[in-house]
Protein backbone atom coordinates (compact mmCIF):
# COMPACT_ATOMS: atom_id res chain seq x y z
CA UNK A 1 0.00 0.00 0.00
CA UNK A 2 2.98 2.31 0.41
CA UNK A 3 3.08 2.42 -3.40
CA UNK A 4 0.00 4.63 -3.18
CA UNK A 5 2.16 7.29 -1.53
CA UNK A 6 4.60 7.14 -4.42
CA UNK A 7 1.92 7.25 -7.12
CA UNK A 8 -0.74 9.52 -5.58
CA UNK A 9 1.40 11.70 -3.31
CA UNK A 10 2.76 15.16 -4.03
CA UNK A 11 4.98 15.90 -7.01
CA UNK A 12 7.81 17.65 -5.21
CA UNK A 13 9.40 18.69 -8.51
CA UNK A 14 6.26 20.54 -9.64
CA UNK A 15 4.70 22.02 -6.54
CA UNK A 16 4.15 25.26 -4.62
CA UNK A 17 7.78 25.27 -3.50
CA UNK A 18 8.87 25.41 -7.14
CA UNK A 19 6.48 28.27 -7.91
CA UNK A 20 7.88 30.19 -4.96
CA UNK A 21 11.42 29.66 -6.20
CA UNK A 22 10.39 30.85 -9.66
CA UNK A 23 9.31 34.11 -8.05
CA UNK A 24 12.54 34.38 -6.07
CA UNK A 25 14.60 33.79 -9.22
CA UNK A 26 12.60 36.37 -11.20
CA UNK A 27 13.37 39.06 -8.61
CA UNK A 28 17.02 38.20 -8.09
CA UNK A 29 16.77 36.52 -4.69
CA UNK A 30 18.59 33.33 -3.76
CA UNK A 31 16.67 30.14 -4.52
CA UNK A 32 16.67 26.89 -2.56
CA UNK A 33 14.84 24.53 -4.96
CA UNK A 34 14.13 24.07 -8.64
CA UNK A 35 11.70 26.45 -10.31
CA UNK A 36 8.30 25.69 -11.87
CA UNK A 37 8.92 25.67 -15.62
CA UNK A 38 5.33 26.46 -16.57
CA UNK A 39 5.53 29.64 -14.48
CA UNK A 40 9.04 30.57 -15.66
CA UNK A 41 7.72 30.89 -19.20
CA UNK A 42 5.51 33.81 -18.18
CA UNK A 43 7.82 35.34 -15.59
CA UNK A 44 10.53 35.66 -18.25
CA UNK A 45 8.41 38.19 -20.14
CA UNK A 46 9.38 40.92 -17.68
CA UNK A 47 6.04 42.38 -16.62
CA UNK A 48 6.46 45.37 -14.32
CA UNK A 49 4.07 43.85 -11.76
CA UNK A 50 3.95 40.19 -10.76
CA UNK A 51 1.00 39.17 -8.57
CA UNK A 52 0.42 35.77 -6.98
CA UNK A 53 -3.13 35.56 -5.62
CA UNK A 54 -3.64 32.44 -3.52
CA UNK A 55 -7.28 31.49 -2.94
CA UNK A 56 -7.50 28.96 -0.12
CA UNK A 57 -8.69 25.53 -1.37
CA UNK A 58 -9.55 26.75 -4.89
CA UNK A 59 -8.09 23.53 -6.29
CA UNK A 60 -8.51 22.17 -9.78
CA UNK A 61 -11.40 19.90 -8.78
CA UNK A 62 -13.23 22.87 -7.26
CA UNK A 63 -12.89 24.88 -10.47
CA UNK A 64 -14.31 21.93 -12.40
CA UNK A 65 -17.25 21.49 -10.01
CA UNK A 66 -18.37 25.10 -10.07
CA UNK A 67 -17.06 27.16 -12.99
CA UNK A 68 -17.61 27.19 -16.74
CA UNK A 69 -14.79 26.12 -19.04
CA UNK A 70 -14.98 29.44 -20.86
CA UNK A 71 -15.05 31.47 -17.64
CA UNK A 72 -12.13 33.61 -16.49
CA UNK A 73 -10.39 31.03 -14.30
CA UNK A 74 -10.66 27.90 -16.44
CA UNK A 75 -10.04 29.66 -19.75
CA UNK A 76 -6.80 31.04 -18.32
CA UNK A 77 -5.71 27.73 -16.75
CA UNK A 78 -2.16 27.13 -17.99
CA UNK A 79 -1.09 24.21 -15.82
CA UNK A 80 -2.17 21.92 -13.01
CA UNK A 81 0.54 21.27 -10.46
CA UNK A 82 0.88 19.95 -6.92
CA UNK A 83 0.41 21.01 -3.35
CA UNK A 84 2.76 19.67 -0.67
CA UNK A 85 2.14 17.07 2.02
CA UNK A 86 -0.05 17.42 3.85
CA UNK A 87 -2.16 19.44 1.39
CA UNK A 88 -3.36 21.88 4.00
CA UNK A 89 -3.13 25.60 4.67
CA UNK A 90 -0.46 25.63 7.38
CA UNK A 91 1.99 23.45 5.45
CA UNK A 92 1.19 24.71 1.95
CA UNK A 93 0.98 28.48 2.50
CA UNK A 94 4.18 28.31 4.54
CA UNK A 95 5.84 26.52 1.61
CA UNK A 96 4.87 29.18 -0.92
CA UNK A 97 5.73 31.96 1.54
CA UNK A 98 9.12 30.48 2.41
CA UNK A 99 10.16 28.64 -0.74
CA UNK A 100 10.82 25.62 1.49
CA UNK A 101 9.40 22.12 1.69
CA UNK A 102 7.46 21.20 4.86
CA UNK A 103 10.36 19.03 6.04
CA UNK A 104 12.52 22.17 5.87
CA UNK A 105 10.19 24.70 7.51
CA UNK A 106 8.48 22.33 9.96
CA UNK A 107 4.97 23.82 9.78
CA UNK A 108 3.45 20.38 9.22
CA UNK A 109 -0.24 20.90 9.97
CA UNK A 110 -2.97 22.72 11.83
CA UNK A 111 -1.91 21.23 15.18
CA UNK A 112 1.82 20.68 15.64
CA UNK A 113 3.47 18.74 18.44
CA UNK A 114 6.24 20.87 19.95
CA UNK A 115 8.62 18.73 22.03
CA UNK A 116 9.98 21.93 23.61
CA UNK A 117 6.55 22.47 25.20
CA UNK A 118 5.36 18.85 25.22
CA UNK A 119 2.08 20.13 23.77
CA UNK A 120 -0.01 19.90 20.63
CA UNK A 121 -0.32 23.52 19.52
CA UNK A 122 -2.65 25.09 16.95
CA UNK A 123 0.02 26.86 14.92
CA UNK A 124 -1.87 29.90 13.62
CA UNK A 125 -3.61 30.77 16.90
CA UNK A 126 -0.88 29.63 19.34
CA UNK A 127 -3.46 27.89 21.50
CA UNK A 128 -3.35 24.39 22.92
CA UNK A 129 -5.08 21.94 20.58
CA UNK A 130 -8.87 21.88 20.84
CA UNK A 131 -10.11 19.08 23.10
CA UNK A 132 -13.42 17.78 24.36
CA UNK A 133 -14.47 18.02 28.00
CA UNK A 134 -14.24 14.73 29.82
CA UNK A 135 -17.68 13.14 29.98
CA UNK A 136 -19.20 15.60 27.49
CA UNK A 137 -22.45 14.54 25.86
CA UNK A 138 -24.58 15.91 23.02
CA UNK A 139 -27.35 18.10 24.36
CA UNK A 140 -29.27 19.47 21.40
CA UNK A 141 -31.70 17.55 19.22
CA UNK A 142 -32.15 18.67 15.61
CA UNK A 143 -35.26 18.50 13.42
CA UNK A 144 -34.40 14.92 12.44
CA UNK A 145 -34.41 13.93 16.13
CA UNK A 146 -30.65 13.43 16.07
CA UNK A 147 -28.45 14.68 18.88
CA UNK A 148 -26.00 17.43 18.05
CA UNK A 149 -22.84 18.50 19.81
CA UNK A 150 -22.50 22.09 20.96
CA UNK A 151 -19.47 24.25 21.65
CA UNK A 152 -20.18 23.73 25.35
CA UNK A 153 -18.69 20.25 24.88
CA UNK A 154 -15.26 21.80 24.26
CA UNK A 155 -12.59 22.90 26.69
CA UNK A 156 -11.75 26.60 26.63
CA UNK A 157 -8.75 27.30 24.37
CA UNK A 158 -5.66 28.14 26.40
CA UNK A 159 -2.54 29.98 25.22
CA UNK A 160 0.23 27.51 24.41
CA UNK A 161 3.07 29.90 25.22
CA UNK A 162 3.77 33.60 25.75
CA UNK A 163 5.16 34.00 22.24
CA UNK A 164 4.10 32.17 19.09
CA UNK A 165 5.43 28.63 19.42
CA UNK A 166 5.53 28.20 15.65
CA UNK A 167 7.52 31.36 14.97
CA UNK A 168 9.73 30.79 18.03
CA UNK A 169 10.72 27.20 17.28
CA UNK A 170 10.15 27.11 13.50
CA UNK A 171 11.22 30.54 12.22
CA UNK A 172 11.61 31.22 8.51
CA UNK A 173 12.11 34.26 6.27
CA UNK A 174 9.26 34.87 3.84
CA UNK A 175 9.77 35.58 0.15
CA UNK A 176 8.53 39.17 0.45
CA UNK A 177 11.36 39.96 2.85
CA UNK A 178 13.87 37.93 0.84
CA UNK A 179 13.06 39.84 -2.35
CA UNK A 180 13.27 43.18 -0.55
CA UNK A 181 16.61 42.23 1.00
CA UNK A 182 17.91 41.23 -2.44
CA UNK A 183 17.19 44.74 -3.71
CA UNK A 184 13.78 44.10 -5.21
CA UNK A 185 10.40 45.43 -4.18
CA UNK A 186 7.73 43.14 -2.74
CA UNK A 187 4.50 43.60 -0.81
CA UNK A 188 1.84 41.46 0.89
CA UNK A 189 -1.92 41.85 0.57
CA UNK A 190 -3.52 39.71 3.25
CA UNK A 191 -5.55 40.29 6.39
CA UNK A 192 -2.74 39.20 8.74
CA UNK A 193 -0.21 41.86 7.68
CA UNK A 194 -0.35 45.69 7.44
CA UNK A 195 -2.51 47.37 6.32
CA UNK A 196 -4.67 44.36 7.31
CA UNK A 197 -7.27 44.28 4.49
CA UNK A 198 -10.22 42.52 6.13
CA UNK A 199 -12.34 41.63 3.09
CA UNK A 200 -11.68 40.07 -0.30
CA UNK A 201 -12.56 43.35 -1.95
CA UNK A 202 -9.95 45.17 0.14
CA UNK A 203 -7.30 42.56 -0.71
CA UNK A 204 -7.99 43.15 -4.41
CA UNK A 205 -8.11 46.94 -3.97
CA UNK A 206 -4.65 46.84 -2.41
CA UNK A 207 -3.36 44.81 -5.36
CA UNK A 208 -4.73 47.45 -7.75
CA UNK A 209 -3.26 50.29 -5.71
CA UNK A 210 0.20 48.69 -5.60
CA UNK A 211 0.15 47.84 -9.31
CA UNK A 212 -0.64 51.46 -10.15
CA UNK A 213 2.48 52.65 -8.35
CA UNK A 214 5.69 53.06 -10.41
CA UNK A 215 8.48 50.51 -10.37
CA UNK A 216 8.88 46.77 -10.71
CA UNK A 217 7.34 44.78 -7.88
CA UNK A 218 6.02 41.47 -6.58
CA UNK A 219 2.75 41.17 -4.66
CA UNK A 220 1.69 38.11 -2.68
CA UNK A 221 -2.03 38.11 -1.88
CA UNK A 222 -4.11 35.61 0.07
CA UNK A 223 -7.75 35.11 0.97
CA UNK A 224 -9.25 32.31 3.09
CA UNK A 225 -12.15 31.42 0.78
CA UNK A 226 -13.59 29.18 -0.53
CA UNK A 227 -11.92 26.98 2.12
CA UNK A 228 -13.83 28.53 5.03
CA UNK A 229 -17.24 28.00 3.45
CA UNK A 230 -16.50 24.51 2.12
CA UNK A 231 -15.33 23.29 5.52
CA UNK A 232 -18.72 24.24 6.95
CA UNK A 233 -21.00 23.32 4.04
CA UNK A 234 -19.14 20.89 1.77
CA UNK A 235 -17.74 21.32 -1.72
CA UNK A 236 -20.98 21.32 -3.71
CA UNK A 237 -23.27 23.40 -1.49
CA UNK A 238 -25.09 26.46 -2.77
CA UNK A 239 -23.12 28.58 -0.33
CA UNK A 240 -19.80 27.28 -1.68
CA UNK A 241 -20.93 27.75 -5.27
CA UNK A 242 -21.98 31.34 -4.66
CA UNK A 243 -18.66 32.21 -3.00
CA UNK A 244 -16.62 30.65 -5.81
CA UNK A 245 -18.58 32.30 -8.62
CA UNK A 246 -18.40 35.66 -6.86
CA UNK A 247 -14.63 35.39 -6.37
CA UNK A 248 -14.08 34.58 -10.03
CA UNK A 249 -16.08 37.64 -11.10
CA UNK A 250 -14.18 39.93 -8.74
CA UNK A 251 -10.78 38.68 -9.90
CA UNK A 252 -11.86 39.05 -13.52
CA UNK A 253 -12.87 42.64 -12.81
CA UNK A 254 -9.53 43.33 -11.12
CA UNK A 255 -7.59 41.87 -14.06
CA UNK A 256 -9.44 44.15 -16.49
CA UNK A 257 -8.08 47.19 -14.62
CA UNK A 258 -4.42 46.14 -14.53
CA UNK A 259 -1.65 46.96 -16.98
CA UNK A 260 1.87 45.58 -17.50
CA UNK A 261 0.96 42.93 -14.92
CA UNK A 262 1.35 39.18 -14.70
CA UNK A 263 -1.48 37.87 -12.50
CA UNK A 264 -1.07 34.29 -11.27
CA UNK A 265 -4.03 32.78 -9.41
CA UNK A 266 -3.48 29.52 -7.57
CA UNK A 267 -4.45 27.58 -4.44
CA UNK A 268 -2.69 26.01 -1.50
CA UNK A 269 -4.61 22.73 -1.87
CA UNK A 270 -7.99 21.48 -3.03
CA UNK A 271 -10.97 20.20 -1.04
CA UNK A 272 -13.16 17.10 -0.79
CA UNK A 273 -16.35 15.95 0.92
CA UNK A 274 -15.49 14.05 4.06
CA UNK A 275 -17.02 11.23 6.09
CA UNK A 276 -16.14 12.17 9.65
CA UNK A 277 -15.39 10.08 12.71
CA UNK A 278 -14.32 11.03 16.24
CA UNK A 279 -11.35 9.21 17.70
CA UNK A 280 -12.94 9.31 21.17
CA UNK A 281 -15.41 6.70 19.93
CA UNK A 282 -12.50 4.26 19.50
CA UNK A 283 -11.14 3.65 23.02
CA UNK A 284 -9.16 0.65 21.83
CA UNK A 285 -7.09 3.13 19.81
CA UNK A 286 -6.96 6.02 22.28
CA UNK A 287 -5.86 3.68 25.07
CA UNK A 288 -2.66 3.15 23.07
CA UNK A 289 -1.79 6.84 22.84
CA UNK A 290 0.44 9.09 24.91
CA UNK A 291 -1.62 12.08 23.73
CA UNK A 292 -4.32 12.79 21.17
CA UNK A 293 -3.11 12.88 17.56
CA UNK A 294 -1.73 16.09 16.09
CA UNK A 295 -1.41 17.52 12.56
CA UNK A 296 -4.73 17.00 10.72
CA UNK A 297 -7.91 14.86 10.71
CA UNK A 298 -6.65 13.33 7.44
CA UNK A 299 -3.01 13.09 8.52
CA UNK A 300 -2.86 11.87 12.10
CA UNK A 301 0.37 11.97 14.08
CA UNK A 302 0.39 9.27 16.79
CA UNK A 303 2.68 9.02 19.80
CA UNK A 304 2.17 5.50 21.13
CA UNK A 305 2.74 4.12 24.63
CA UNK A 306 5.69 1.76 24.85
CA UNK A 307 3.56 -1.27 25.64
CA UNK A 308 1.49 -0.80 22.45
CA UNK A 309 4.20 0.05 19.92
CA UNK A 310 4.32 -3.46 18.49
CA UNK A 311 0.55 -3.97 18.37
CA UNK A 312 -0.64 -0.48 17.39
CA UNK A 313 -0.58 -1.11 13.66
CA UNK A 314 -2.88 -4.12 14.03
CA UNK A 315 -5.20 -2.29 16.44
CA UNK A 316 -5.46 0.73 14.15
CA UNK A 317 -6.21 -1.36 11.08
CA UNK A 318 -8.81 -3.36 13.01
CA UNK A 319 -10.69 -0.12 13.73
CA UNK A 320 -10.13 1.85 10.51
CA UNK A 321 -9.46 -0.81 7.89
CA UNK A 322 -8.00 0.39 4.61
CA UNK A 323 -9.19 3.98 4.94
CA UNK A 324 -5.69 5.05 5.99
CA UNK A 325 -2.11 4.26 5.09
CA UNK A 326 -0.24 3.85 8.38
CA UNK A 327 3.48 4.66 8.26
CA UNK A 328 6.14 4.41 10.91
CA UNK A 329 8.33 7.42 11.70
CA UNK A 330 11.17 5.69 9.83
CA UNK A 331 9.00 5.23 6.73
CA UNK A 332 7.82 8.85 6.86
CA UNK A 333 11.40 10.09 6.83
CA UNK A 334 12.72 7.57 4.30
CA UNK A 335 9.84 8.18 1.88
CA UNK A 336 10.34 11.97 2.13
CA UNK A 337 6.64 12.42 2.90
CA UNK A 338 7.08 16.04 3.94
CA UNK A 339 9.49 17.06 1.20
CA UNK A 340 12.76 16.45 -0.59
CA UNK A 341 14.78 19.21 1.04
CA UNK A 342 17.14 18.79 3.98
CA UNK A 343 15.21 17.79 7.10
CA UNK A 344 14.96 20.62 9.59
CA UNK A 345 16.83 20.03 12.83
CA UNK A 346 14.45 18.38 15.28
CA UNK A 347 11.96 17.29 12.61
CA UNK A 348 12.02 13.64 13.70
CA UNK A 349 11.06 14.67 17.25
CA UNK A 350 7.89 16.30 15.87
CA UNK A 351 6.84 13.11 14.11
CA UNK A 352 5.15 10.41 16.17
CA UNK A 353 5.73 6.68 16.21
CA UNK A 354 3.12 6.36 13.45
CA UNK A 355 1.47 8.71 10.96
CA UNK A 356 -1.85 7.79 9.33
CA UNK A 357 -2.57 9.18 5.85
CA UNK A 358 -6.18 9.19 4.63
CA UNK A 359 -6.60 7.33 1.34
CA UNK A 360 -10.42 7.41 1.35
CA UNK A 361 -13.03 10.02 2.28
CA UNK A 362 -12.71 9.28 6.03
CA UNK A 363 -11.38 11.93 8.43
CA UNK A 364 -10.79 11.40 12.16
CA UNK A 365 -11.31 14.35 14.50
CA UNK A 366 -10.36 14.68 18.16
CA UNK A 367 -13.78 16.10 19.13
CA UNK A 368 -17.36 15.19 18.24
CA UNK A 369 -18.17 18.85 17.62
CA UNK A 370 -15.54 19.26 14.90
CA UNK A 371 -16.53 15.98 13.28
CA UNK A 372 -20.12 17.20 13.17
CA UNK A 373 -19.56 20.70 11.73
CA UNK A 374 -16.81 20.03 9.13
CA UNK A 375 -18.31 18.18 6.15
CA UNK A 376 -15.58 19.50 3.86
CA UNK A 377 -11.96 18.53 4.33
CA UNK A 378 -8.46 18.11 2.91
CA UNK A 379 -4.92 17.15 4.02
CA UNK A 380 -5.05 13.50 2.94
CA UNK A 381 -3.44 11.34 0.29
CA UNK A 382 -5.91 11.54 -2.60
CA UNK A 383 -5.19 13.06 -5.99
CA UNK A 384 -8.18 15.38 -5.63
CA UNK A 385 -6.61 17.10 -2.63
CA UNK A 386 -3.24 17.76 -4.31
CA UNK A 387 -4.16 19.13 -7.72
CA UNK A 388 -4.00 22.93 -7.85
CA UNK A 389 -4.28 25.35 -10.78
CA UNK A 390 -1.81 27.73 -12.35
CA UNK A 391 -4.13 30.39 -13.72
CA UNK A 392 -2.28 33.08 -15.66
CA UNK A 393 -3.64 36.39 -16.92
CA UNK A 394 -1.31 38.82 -18.71
CA UNK A 395 -2.29 42.45 -18.86
Where are these regions (language model features)?
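Feature captures the catalytic ectodomains and active-site-proximal regions of enzymes
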Residues: 1-395
